[in-house]
Design a protein with these regions (language model features):
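Bacterial N-terminal signal peptides
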Residues: 5-17
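Extracytoplasmic metal-acquisition and chelation regions
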Residues: 20-320
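N-terminal secretory signal peptides that target proteins for export/translocation
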Residues: 1-2
Length: 320
């Protein structure tokens, strides 16, 4: 008898607690640290903070969803991701029709600049750059597919995309939490201004080394390289989960041994032994590029700091 009386009370209490949690603000989950950093900046001063699904040391290319992370997603009012070409481990979950209203896919936003993925090995001469307004540049047709749609999914490494993403985040949050709509939109504008200053500082820092040639671990940086006019010559892999074949390795070994490379960049999340084997055969500078900001503290300054950290790493390894 007591159990029959208590059960409705327990259910009512659970519903009340859940409602109170929602009354405290929207439950937001950002899939990767760069998205989390932008969202934290947009939510500053609202009394709410986003949750981070993947820590910076985990590559989204190689991630596997744990039960605790699945629970985070299940409880979220808003899930912010780059898109299915990056967070492939979420495809089966987030692409379900019932989740459409809860998911903000940043790579699909109007105004986002997408860069064509380049093949592993030596890059071809040319990169497509386009947005929803049809902006394109000349390119070669000899590239291999980078991801599902052939476009580089690392859209956050172009600061122009960072501005677009911040505005979209603010607009979506304003719908979920109208009481703080002005705060969200003001924060997005403030982040855009900080990115203006960051972009100017990076442009000045990298100007002396724009002509210096280098190799990267995987083709993740087309947005950053295109924005700042850099001179990459190739990538060891088109994507970390797809290591190059023997022909590509030989091609890259030849490039490195030619003496025309100022630096070879690896990544803290991914540092394959076969890259080290190639480097051991040659006297070439080695640097580290961190597209996810593994060493940076999370928070409102994370995203501008991530871009600046990339610039510093490039400058320090490429300078004569």
């Amino acid at each position: 008898m007591w159990s029959r009386r208590l059960l409705p009370m327990i259910l009512l209490f659970s519903i009340a607690v859940h409602a109170q949690a929602r009354a405290d603000g929207p439950a937001v989950v950002a899939t990767i640290a760069p998205v989390h950093g932008s969202h934290a900046a947009v939510m500053e001063g609202s009394g709410h903070v986003p949750a981070l699904l993947l820590p910076g040391q985990t590559s989204p290319h190689l991630a596997r969803l744990r039960p605790s992370q699945a629970a985070m997603l299940e409880d979220a009012d808003l899930i912010v991701r780059i898109g299915p070409d990056l967070e492939t481990f979420l495809d089966h979950l987030l692409d379900a029709p019932e989740n459409a209203a809860r998911v903000l896919t940043l790579e699909d936003l109007p105004g986002i600049v997408r860069h064509e993925g380049r093949r592993a090995g030596a890059f071809e001469t040319g990169v497509i750059v386009h947005d929803d307004h049809g902006m394109t540049s000349d390119h070669d047709n000899g590239h291999e597919d980078h991801d599902h749609d052939g476009l580089d999914p690392h859209i956050w490494l172009d600061p122009e995309n960072g501005r677009v993403m911040a505005v979209a985040m603010a607009d979506r949050l304003a719908l979920l939490d109208p009481a703080h709509a002005e705060t969200y939109r003001a924060n997005a504008a403030a982040l855009g201004k900080r990115l203006d200053g960051t972009e100017q500082a990076i442009d000045a820092m990298l100007a002396p080394v724009r002509h210096r040639r280098y190799l990267v671990l995987h083709d993740a940086y087309s947005g950053f390289e295109g924005r700042f006019g850099l001179s990459p010559v190739g990538a060891f892999s088109v994507a970390p989960e797809r290591p190059p074949g023997s022909r590509r390795v030989e091609e890259l070994r030849h490039i490195v041994s030619s003496g025309d490379i100022a630096c070879v960049f690896t990544e803290p999340q991914l540092d394959p032994a076969w890259v080290e084997a190639i480097l051991a055969e040659n006297s070439v500078n080695k640097g580290v590029l961190d597209p996810l900001g593994m060493t940076l503290p999370t928070g409102v300054e994370f995203y501008p700091a991530l871009l600046m950290n990339l610039a510093i790493s490039l400058h320090d390894c490429l300078r004569p």
